[in-house]
Amino acid sequence: MSRKLSHVLLIGVGLFSSTWVMAAVKEYDLTIAEQTVNITGKPLKRITVNGKFVAPLLEFEEGDDAVIRVHNKLKNQDSSIHWHGLILPGIMDGVPGFNQFDGIAPNKTYEYKFKVRQNGTYWYHSHSKGQEQDGLYGPLVIYPKNKVPLTAGEKADRDYVVLLSDFHNSTSGQIMSNLKKEADYYQNRRETVFDVFRQIKRDGLKATWKDRSMWNQMRMLKTDMSDVTNYTFLMNGKTPEQNWTGNFKAGEKVRLRFINASAMSLFDVRIPNLKMTVVSADGQPVKPVPVDEFRIGTAETYDVIVEPKQANYQIEAESIDRSGFSIGTLHDENTSPVKSIVMPTPRPRALLTMEDMGMNHDMSSMKGMDHDMSSMKGMDHDMSSMKGMDHDMSSMKGMDHDMSSMKGMDHDMSS
């Protein structure tokens, strides 16, 4: 063998060894089971992961080789886990019926293996039946390599996941059955005749008649802000009364990684008397945007930096239909004990408009339209598929998605 060839082979082996050493293998075992949980004071059977409700935080660094063994201990249900927002091979995506993945049968194990090719705030959840609603969801955070901050604006002294979710006393199967009986089954804050009179006084009889006729043609209510109501809203799996708390010390910067893991609830998030700076959206860094409040849609994530000065702050995530709050606390650990939460007064209920529906025009003049709307090919009567409706609420004015890497630090969801 020539000296030149030997030299080339030696370099190749060295590079391979260097790459192999740098790529850490991060392994997790997740056991899916059904257990009794007590969230609202009533013991109920729900899905747990490793005995926890909600599922545990998974942490990686960019470049890791992820190995996640999922053990399905549900008695009569296939299961699955989808890694929301992650770039990975199709067979590892975790959606039954796609990419030759059939789900995980009862008492079987499936091993997810993939290279972690990005960083940011993400989450994971079931893609089987209504298991996500029943508890199979959890946070997932990927740090930059060696957890080195990428920009000065993202540097923080503390780093917390704030997982928002909704819990119902009915199972996902019961909820779906009710919605099949009546699409408006859970609309228990409907308008009354007095609302109609107020609209007539404000807009006039003709305009009111036209507006009401259009909503009737769509078979939809103006109050249909959320498909399901009677939820208890959670923060990191805790009710407002249980008061999830993130600690800090005076002068520290705190990163809050908000994840909306709800089944179908949107939230308006605020921390009274504390400005937030949005630094990331859906795992992607953005030009910093200072805000007093932001709206987070289902499955979205937003990272914010805060610089608390007071001893206590209340984190308030108000549901878009104004039916309740997910609440937690930021607390200076060097001060007096954490204060009890103060339940805010809900803001006035909003009503949908035709503009919200992408229908700010005269429907009655549309040629060939059957006014009962039932014959329109491909139209879902809950209007969720209508062009013009933004479901994920991800567009925030002034936000610049530059797709570059994020940074991150250790999380603490235990408090």
Residue ranges and their predicted role:
Residues 130-136, 312, 320-327:
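Short acidic/polar inter-strand loop motif in beta-rich domains
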Residues 365-415:
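Thr-biased low-complexity repeat/linker tracts and other Thr-enriched repetitive architectures
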Residues 11, 21-22:
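Cleavable N-terminal signal peptides
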Residues 23-270, 274-296, 335-372:
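Histidine-centered copper-binding motifs that mark active-site loops
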Residues 299:
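Ligand-binding face of N-terminal immunoglobulin V-set domains in extracellular IgSF glycoproteins
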Residues 1-9:
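Bacterial N-terminal signal peptides that target proteins for export
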Residues 112-118, 302-310:
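Short, hydrophobic beta-strand segments
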